[in-house]
Amino acid sequence: MSSVPKRAKLDGAPADGNTSAAAGNNEEESEALEQIDACQNEIDALNEKASEEILKVEQKYNKLRKPCYEKRSELVKRIPNFWVTSFINHPQVSGILDEEEEECLHALNKLEVEEFEDIKSGYRINFHFDENPYFENKVLTKEFHLNSAAASENGDWPASTSTPIKWKEGKNLLKLLLTKPYGNKKKRNSEYKTFFDWFSDNTDPVNDEIAELIKDDLWPNPLQYYLVPDIEVEPEDEEDNEDNDEEAFDDEDGEDGEGEEEEEDEDDK
């Protein structure tokens, strides 16, 4: 039972006539608190049961969705650059894509998210690649083990693991991008500098925003991002610079004109 909240003591003892009434009130309050506590226990039990049933329903529909995802994956292969386009058009995921990584991701022919049997325990993200000039791997996988039921091979949880990337000679993007200036045109709204930096990092599996975006947003419906219309981006600040130059030129002319007028006035005098 929940502990009874403390109440401020009243100054002075109650009059003899009120003693029995106060005792009756305390007894009634204690009984009510016991009943409230019993109700709360019942609610908690129902919530727990609901979670278990929701989990079973989710597992059932994960199996039902699987053939649809597989069919979609086969159809996607007929569309060149489907996944890299979806990545580029995603407002958050695009924030960690370097230009050379975009070139690399043109070889991405399939994205796949697999939830573990107990969906609360974790999931894996599989990136399938065609032959490409950057690495030897055909599949790169990042796994998330979020509770003891899905502890990683060394028994740790929460934990995440990533496939070691077999970079081709001179093509290690993690090393190449370390030497590039960080001032890219794209705004970086993430703690990760680049896509492969995110893929290789396993320090905080519980709060991996990019993984959650891929699993819960990009994977269920990539078409909404692939079909985002192209937006023409005007060269940054060119017009503003021209306007500023014109204003500066006008200001100089104005100052020169004022100087000439003052000289003419002095000559007239």
From Swiss-Prot:
Q: Where is this region: Disordered?
A: 1-33, 227-269
SUPFAM superfamilies hit by this protein? NAP-like
Write one Gene Ontology MF term.
chromatin binding
Instruction: Offer a single GO CC term for the protein.
Output: nucleus
Which residues, renumbered to this chain, carry the PTM Phosphoserine?
Answer: S30, S148, S152
Q: Which GO terms describe its biological process?
A: nucleosome assembly
Give the transmembrane region(s).
none
UniProt keywords, alphabetically: Phosphoprotein
- The reply to whether Phosphoprotein figures as a keyword in the UniProt entry is yes
Name the family: Belongs to the nucleosome assembly protein (NAP) family.
Q: How does it assemble?
A: Interacts specifically with B-type cyclins.
**What is this protein's record name?**
Protein SET
Species assigned in the record: Drosophila melanogaster (Fruit fly)
